[in-house]
Amino acid sequence: MNKKMTDYVIDLVEVLNKQQKQVFWGIFDAASMISSIIVSYILFYGLINPAPVDYVIYTSLTFLFYQIMIGFWGLNASISRYSKITDFMKIFIGVSVSSVLSYLLCYAFLPLFSVRFIVLFILLSTFLILLPRITWQLIYSRRKKSDGEGEHRRTFLIGAGDGGALFMNSYQHPTSDLELVGILDNDEKKKGQKLGGIPVLGSYDQLPELAKRHQIEKVIVAIPSLDPSEYERILKMCNQLGLKCYKMPKIESVVQGLHPQVGGFQKIDITDLLGRKEIQLDESRLGPEITGKTILVTGAGGSIGSEICRQVSRFNPERVVLLGHGENSIYLIYHELIRSFQGIDYVPVIADIQDYDRLLQVFEQYQPAIVYHAAAHKHVPMMERNPKEAFKNNILGTYNVAKAVDAAKVPKMVMISTDKAVNPPNVMGATKRVAELIVTGFNQRSQSTYCAVRFGNVLGSRGSVIPVFERQIAEGGPVTVTDFRMTRYFMTIPEASRLVIHAGAYAKDGEVFILDMGKPVKIYDLAKKMVLLSGRTENEIPIVEVGIRPGEKLYEELLVSTELVDNQVMDKIFVGKVNVMPLEVINQKIEEFRALQGSELKQAIIGFANETTHIH
C-alpha cells in the first residue's frame, strides 16, 4: 500500500466517532473469529461442511464473551495508535477466556472438538485481531516520523503520586515522542521505587544534576496540587538548563472536556505563577438557583459573559438567553454551547442594551429568573478618549437593564463591576461606580433583588495585559510596563464567573461582592515571569517603563471604609454595602450628563462618582 493510500485510510478512520469505531472494530473482530474457526476446521479435518451449527454457536458465544470483556476494559473502540503492550495482552486474554468459557458451555449439549482445536482457534483469532492494530500503529508511527514528529525526546516526569500514575497510565504508548527516562519526587520514601516501570531517581531539587547526567530535553510536571511558587522554581531551573517544561492539565478540565486526555500536557502558563492557587467555592447553593430555570446573560459573547454561560450550564438550566450586540461573538458562543451541553435551550438574541424597548420585549418574552449583566466597555485608555460611549454603554445601558428587570418582574439581577469603581480617577471606573449606584437604587424601590460584583483584572480576557505581553515577547520585545511600581489584583476567568454566580445565590439587599484575590501583583513582576515562561532572559527581551497612561492608578482598591461590613457570606468572598442614592437624584444626574461632551462629560462623571463614594 503506497503512502497516499495509507494516509487516506488513516484519515478516513480518524474522523470516525467513538460509536462508529466500536462498530468498525467489532465487525473486523467478528470477521477474524469466523475466519479463524473456518481455517482451524480445514487444518484439522481437511474440509468444511456447510455452516455446521455447533461451530456457529461456539463462535457466536466466543465473540459475545469477548465483546463483553474488551468493553469492560474500554478497548472496544481502541485505535491502535493509542494502544499499549498491556492492551494487546488484554486482547489475548479476552480471546482465550472467551474461547474456554464457550467450550465449557458447549460441552454439555454440543459435539466436542479437541483441546488442540481450541488452542489453534485462540492463536489464529488473536493473530488476526492484533494484526491490523499493530499494522495501524506502525503506519501511524512512520507517518509521524515522516512529518518530523517521530524523534523521541528524553524526558523527566516530576511527581510519583496520583498525578504521575494517571499520566503514566494514559500517555505512555509506543508512538509517543517521549522517552521517559526517570521520575523525580521530593518524597524520599519513593526514591528507588518504580512507577509503570520507570524508576524514581531522586527529588526535583536534583533536577540540574540528574538532567545533565541523563541528557534530558523535556520535563513534565504531574503534580496537580503543586504550589505556584514551586512551579516557578521548577520553571526557572528548566530555563537555566535549556529544558522545555510542561504540565499535566487539571483533572477537572479533563472531566469537563476542556482538555482531550489526562496524559496530554501543556505549557505552564502565567495563571500558575500568580502566587496563589485558583479559588474553588462551595457550589451547594447554586443548583436550586439555576437548575430548571431561565437565565439571561448580557454581553454573552464577551470573555466574562461567555464563561458565565458555560458555568451556569453545568447546573442544567432550562434555558439560557445569550444577549449581545456583536453577532459574531454570540454566534461563536451559541455554537460552542449547543455542542458542549445537551438538553438546554440556548437562545441567541442580538440586542443593544442602550435600547430599552428591545430589552423589555426580550425580558417579558423569556421571563428569566436571573439576569447576569456583563455587557460593558472596560478599557481605561480607550474610554478616556471616548467618554460619551462609556456613559451610553456603562451608565445608560445598566439603567436600561435594571429598569427592564423591574418592569418585567425578573427576580434577580447581578451586575459586573470593577475594582476601578473605587475612588475612580478615570471615566471607565467612574461610569461603573455610577452603575453600582443605579442597581442599588433600584434595589431600594423594586420587588426584584439587585447586587454588584467587583472584579480585579481578569487574566486572559480580551485586551488584558497577558496577551499584550505575549505579543510583545513574540515580536522580540521590548515588553512595556507603564510604571514598575504599579500593582493590580488578578483573577482568572473561571474565578470571576463563579463569583458572579455565587453573588446571585447570596444576594439579599443590594450588596457588593468581592473575591479574596490574595495580595496585589506587581505588573513588572508579571512581565518578568512572562519573559521567563518564554524561555528567554531579560537581556534578550528587555522590559521598559513607558509611563502611566491617562486615567490609570498605581494601586487599585477593593472597598472603601464606608462599604465594609463585619460578616462574610462565605469563605473567600467579601461582602460590602454600597452607599445608596435615591434614583431620582441619579436620574437628574444622568440628564445632566446627556447634555455634556468630551472632557466636560468626563470630569462631571468622575466628580460625581467620587462624591458618592463617602455618602451615608
Language model feature labels by segment:
Residues 2-8, 231-294:
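Flexible, Lys/Arg-rich cytosolic regulatory linkers and terminal tails that connect or flank
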Residues 241, 256-257, 373, 377-436, ...:
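Conserved Rossmann-fold NAD(P)-dependent oxidoreductase catalytic core, especially the SDR/UDP-sugar
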Residues 1-150, 240, 247, 371:
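Signature of alpha-helical transmembrane segments in polytopic membrane proteins
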Residues 350-370:
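Conserved Rossmann-fold cofactor-binding substructure of NAD(P)-dependent oxidoreductases
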Residues 21, 280, 285-289, 441-457, ...:
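Strand-loop microenvironment adjacent to phosphate/nucleotide-handling motifs in alpha/beta enzyme folds
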Residues 45-49, 139-255, 328-332, 339, ...:
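A solvent-exposed beta-alpha-beta segment
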Residues 211, 215-216, 317-318, 363, ...:
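Proline-aspartate-enriched helix->loop->beta-strand connector
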Residues 295-313:
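N-terminal Rossmann NAD(P)H-binding glycine-rich loop of SDR-like oxidoreductase domains
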